[in-house]
Amino acid sequence: MSLAFIFAIAAECFALMLAGGGFYEVLVVDPVWPKRPELIQADRGGISRKRFWIPVHTAFELSVISALVAAWPAPAVRGWLWVALISHAVARVWSFVDFIPKALAFERADPRSITEASARKWTHRSVFRLPLELVSCGATIAAFARLARM
């Protein structure tokens, strides 16, 4: 079993965690928290999203970059890993520029000061990041499949 194969397995596992976490937020957390902002405020007993997202994003990024380096001699694999990394990078840049600052503001604000309309607007826009992570997930599956046939 090659190093590229091991890193591709790791990248796929973390990509699936990212997709699962994204679906969980979209389907379970986001429909509820706009009416109850304290649900996303760890200081008030709510969930701490950063305890999941920071380690999983970091692990995915390190594993996909490692897989890319290890699979560099295999152009078919390398191409899929580039797709995974670039789509993930687009989602991360978008998150850093727009979503994370607003999420942190919601998490720090007095729950009474958060309007349901502003929270719903954020959750509706947040849904559009999920397809980018699904592209990363699909691309890592494709890279893994190519490596498995080598």
Each model region followed by its residue ranges:
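Core segments of transmembrane alpha-helices
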Residues: 54-68, 129-138
